[in-house]
Each structure stands twice: as C-alpha cells, then as structure tokens.
Amino acid sequence: EQGDHVLMTNTAYEPSQDFCSKILSKLGVTTSWFDPLIGADIVKHLQPNTKIVFLESPGSITMEVHDVPAIVAAVRSVVPDAIIMIDNTWAAGVLFKALDFGIDVSIQAATKYLVGHSDAMIGTAVCNARCWEQLRENAYLMGQMVDADTAYITSRGLRTLGVRLRQHHESSLKVSEWLAEHPQVARVNHPALPGSKGHEFWKRDFTGSSGLFSFVLKKKLNDEELANYLDNFSLFSMAYSWGGYESLILANQPE
C-alpha cells in the first residue's frame, strides 16, 4: 500500500527490480536493495514500514546464495509481520524447501523447470497459512488463472522433474568444473562449486543443484568480439528461457 517499504536483494531478476522501481514507485511504495551476502546485518536496512522482504537465492546472473536462516531470524526480530518472499525458480521449488526455512511466500517461473520442455508459460506461488487468504484473494481479483492446456503441460513436467533435475545437476557441474580450469575463464559462479559465493549455504540448505550458472571471461570483449563469440557455439543456442532440455547461453553485463 501507499507508504509501505519493500526491501529487495540487489541480485533479484531484473524485471522484479523494475516492477518495484517503475511500477510500485508510482503507487507510493518505496524500495531499497541489499547485498545478497548480508546475512543477519539485514537489520540495518529494515524500516518500521517494511512490509516485504524479497529474496532470490541463488541470485540472478551472479548466483550468490543467501544465508536464509540468518536473514529470516533478523527480519522476524525487527519487523515480525513483514512478509518474506523468495524467487525459488533456480531450485524449482523442490531443491530448496523455502517454507521450511520460515519464508512466507515462494514464487517461481514454472515456465522453466516445472514445464521442462520450453513449450508453456506459467508462474506459481505457494505460501504458508498466514498468507494464504491474502494470496488467494489477490490472485482471484487479478484474474491470475491458468488455462487447461498449460495446467496439463505443467503437470506432465512434474512427472519427470526429479530425474531431469538430477541430470541438470550432473551436467552443469561437469561443464562448470571444466570452465573453472580453462585459461580464458576468470571465475565460475555455480552454487555447487566450492569457492562460489555462498557455497557453504547451498551445501547446508539445498538438496541439489539445477543447471543454471554463470562464468566470467578474463578478457572483456567488445561488441564485435562478443557477437563473434556467441555466433560460433555449436552445442549451445542463445536464448533466455532456460530450464528445458536445450543447452543455452546468454551474454550479460550485470554491473
């Protein structure tokens, strides 16, 4: 509502950040951002009017993993009624059991791993008992209803989710380990890879890994070099919507 405050990780998916800065701001809702590795120090950013704390773990593009228990405990100690949300797309809602960690609402782009075949678009939101009536009513009032075909396709994807995620884990780790040893690569950001930011929290809190990770080249490419680099991949296509059976790559400048 007007006058409320949202506290969001600065590694949230860019459209999520844009929704706050370009839409909610016009409705009188302010947003501030915090470092994904802040842990219990998040208390320094909480305000009396903080109503939403928005997490995404691992972070978009740069893949930092939150210390979720520390964040949740800190938020509850200062603004106990604030709703803690997480974008749980990377973990497909199953590799990280968000509600078990005290999070109120867990959302994901089910277009990715739940559908699993890049042939439908759907989002999901699950919540605890405290938030259920509010979530149900707002989804109803905003007309957020899935069509029958998409519901069927998503339920089909759920049948193979476990075996697909195990393969994503294995394949992505093999590729990331190979890249980590490559002379042209400065850093690999994969939560399951030792040395990645927040790896210890992934190891403690997650039950596996999906297939999305990032890496940084030692040389910063200009536009022509980058286009040539991407155009010469034979096994990876360039596209946004990961989570299917294809191998995809996308260039990004998160700074």
Short names for language-model regions:
Residues 185-255:
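Conserved C-terminal alpha-helix-loop-beta "cap" of PLP-dependent enzymes
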